[in-house]
């Protein structure tokens, strides 16, 4: 069953991503050829404006409540974020947390390569230099290394989101996780899947080796009511009433070095998640049992009336201003873009040209993030030749 509010939510995001990619990001593509680092600095901030749109729709229009407990983020720090993958949409819901406690412009996501082909969303993700993986380590290792080393060389302060479980929690994926646990003599999990640690250990070691990592944030996400497992649930109007995030921050010095140590460390985090989520879903009302940290600037955020919150880099008033401004801006921008396509032939030609470009470049070059890497390598060689 299709819900009007679900259709409006997804349509608004789709139009924003398509028009934003064409009219906001498209004119900046030539800068990538001249200065990849400046191109990255500017496009990160433009993409971040769109990332506020889903947050604005979820919180202001749909009334979703966000609860964050545990440790805080240090604004501007470079980190790897690991999170349990309860639904296919956790990455989008996380923006509600990062908007308050970090900077959306820093976020990169490690996600499956198929999403690169989605019109609008995939184009913007390519411009944002998200890391697309094929889920074949022999193929992904080289690409991941190139992307991470690029971020290190241009001193890009990224916060890279990774789902070590590799897929969202469903009955089928839980059954496969249980089968893996039986074969390896491990505990069976009910609320999480056993993590795959190869990518995590490689990312942490690479960023640490490139002096581009300050911390690892372990985030546990939970939904007390209404769990939208897939995009189809959003289309049917199923949105969470509350989204709970529990954040644990580990300094890079406290995280083990080497594959074996990192593997054991990550597995221990998942054992903790299982226990934490079990307590969460057995508690009435459902909430993470965490002490208050810092000063709360919001009203009580849980049904129990207890206010548990973490230090933030933005006050709740500032967050509301950002969300209202985002909703107004994107409403006007989408309306203006539609009007220009109806009334302005040059805009129609430009739009058609950019759509064809986005589709063709992926077919022939593999994606804009790969073009950006190639441009960086070219200018690096030019600089090295001049120094010689």
From Swiss-Prot:
Membrane topology of this protein: Multi-pass membrane protein
Main location: endoplasmic reticulum
Transmembrane segments: 9-29, 46-66, 321-341, 342-362
Catalytically driven reaction(s): a 1-acyl-sn-glycero-3-phosphate + an acyl-CoA = a 1,2-diacyl-sn-glycero-3-phosphate + CoA; a 1-acyl-sn-glycero-3-phospho-(1D-myo-inositol) + an acyl-CoA = a 1,2-diacyl-sn-glycero-3-phospho-(1D-myo-inositol) + CoA; 1-acyl-sn-glycero-3-phospho-(1'-sn-glycerol) + an acyl-CoA = a 1,2-diacyl-sn-glycero-3-phospho-(1'-sn-glycerol) + CoA; 1-hexadecanoyl-sn-glycero-3-phosphate + (9Z)-octadecenoyl-CoA = 1-hexadecanoyl-2-(9Z-octadecenoyl)-sn-glycero-3-phosphate + CoA
EC id: 2.3.1.-, 2.3.1.51
Keywords: Acyltransferase, Developmental protein, Endoplasmic reticulum, Lipid biosynthesis, Lipid metabolism, Membrane, Phospholipid biosynthesis, Phospholipid metabolism, Transferase, Transmembrane, Transmembrane helix
Motif (HXXXXD motif): 85-90
GO CC field: endomembrane system; endoplasmic reticulum; endoplasmic reticulum membrane
UniProt-annotated location(s): Endoplasmic reticulum membrane
This protein's pathway: Phospholipid metabolism; CDP-diacylglycerol biosynthesis; CDP-diacylglycerol from sn-glycerol 3-phosphate: step 2/3
Molecular functions (GO terms): 1-acylglycerol-3-phosphate O-acyltransferase activity; acyltransferase activity
GO biological process, one term: hemangioblast cell differentiation
Superkingdom to which the source organism belongs: Eukaryota
Note on domains (UniProt): The HXXXXD motif is essential for acyltransferase activity and may constitute the binding site for the phosphate moiety of the glycerol-3-phosphate.
Role of this protein: Exhibits acyl-CoA:lysocardiolipin acyltransferase (ALCAT) activity; catalyzes the reacylation of lyso-cardiolipin to cardiolipin (CL), a key step in CL remodeling. Recognizes both monolysocardiolipin and dilysocardiolipin as substrates with a preference for linoleoyl-CoA and oleoyl-CoA as acyl donors.
PANTHER family, sorted: 1-ACYLGLYCEROL-3-PHOSPHATE ACYLTRANSFERASE-RELATED (PTHR10983), LYSOCARDIOLIPIN ACYLTRANSFERASE 1 (PTHR10983:SF16)
Family: Belongs to the 1-acyl-sn-glycerol-3-phosphate acyltransferase family.
Protein name as it appears in the record: Lysocardiolipin acyltransferase 1
Species per Swiss-Prot/TrEMBL record: Danio rerio
């Amino acid at each position: 069953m299709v819900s009007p509010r679900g259709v409006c939510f997804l349509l608004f995001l789709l139009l924003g991503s398509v028009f934003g990619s064409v009219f906001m990001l498209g004119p900046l593509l030539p800068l990538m050829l001249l200065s990849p680092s400046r191109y990255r600095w500017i496009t990160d901030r433009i993409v971040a404006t769109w990332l506020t749109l889903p947050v604005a729709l979820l919180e202001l229009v749909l009334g979703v409540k966000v609860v964050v407990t545990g440790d805080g983020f240090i604004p501007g720090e470079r980190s790897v974020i690991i999170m349990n993958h309860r639904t296919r949409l956790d990455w989008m819901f996380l923006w509600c947390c990062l908007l308050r406690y970090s900077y959306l412009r820093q976020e990169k996501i490690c996600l499956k390569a198929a999403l690169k082909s989605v019109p609008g969303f995939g184009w913007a993700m390519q411009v944002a230099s998200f890391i697309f993986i094929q889920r074949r380590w022999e193929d992904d290792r080289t690409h991941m290394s190139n992307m991470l080393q690029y971020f290190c060389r241009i001193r890009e302060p990224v916060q890279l989101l990774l789902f070590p479980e590799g897929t969202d929690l469903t009955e089928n994926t839980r059954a496969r996780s249980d089968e893996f646990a039986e074969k390896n003599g491990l505990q069976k999990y009910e609320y999480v899947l056993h993590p795959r640690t190869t990518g995590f250990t490689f990312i942490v070691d690479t960023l640490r080796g490139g002096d581009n990592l300050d911390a690892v944030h372990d985030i546990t996400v939970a939904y007390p009511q209404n769990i939208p497992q897939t995009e189809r649930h959003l289309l049917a109007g199923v949105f969470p009433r509350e989204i709970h995030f529990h954040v644990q921050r580990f300094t890079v010095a406290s995280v083990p070095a080497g594959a074996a140590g990192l593997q054991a460390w990550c597995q221990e985090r998942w054992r903790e998640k299982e226990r934490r989520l079990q307590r969460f879903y057995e508690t009435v009302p459902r909430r993470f049992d965490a002490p208050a940290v810092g000063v709360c600037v919001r009203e009580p955020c849980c049904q129990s009336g207890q206010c548990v919150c973490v230090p933030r880099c933005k006050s709740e008033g500032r967050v509301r201003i950002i969300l209202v401004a985002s909703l107004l801006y994107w409403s006007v921008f989408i309306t203006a873009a539609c009007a220009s396509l109806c009334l302005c032939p040059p805009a129609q030609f430009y739009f058609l040209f950019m759509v064809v470009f986005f589709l063709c470049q992926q077919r022939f070059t593999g994606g804009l993030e790969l073009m950006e890497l190639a441009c960086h390598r070219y200018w690096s060689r030019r600089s090295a030749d001049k120094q010689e």
